[in-house]
């Protein structure tokens, strides 16, 4: 049995807290507040409403058959939010107010679309949920044709080691 290839794409977003005041102390406070907002924003971006909105966009962009290779669907024909959430990893970039989004899927175009769809809807959902600051996209996700999993070399070496152990014993 062969493991299917998985592809990854990523995008970065910048959290900005602003007061409208422009001086050195206010700028330092804005940077500090932005770093504190990052975790709040990441929780908002993992919410079911955000996942459902991304799922709707994916259904508009891709054939349901292709999507079914990556996600499970509910009785209404929508992508299950939990199956979509499992494909997305959100992390902070150390000592910054940047958020890195990594999406992994069995199709490289879907992985990139997940990232780009998230960045397109994030400002609206963050504004509604938090009401403070903003989130901006730093770059756009690209389609990477090189699979990130399974690691063929690692799996081959592990298989050879296991076979060697069986032969030796």
Locations of the language-model features?
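Hydrophobic and amphipathic membrane-targeting/association helices
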Residues: 1-169
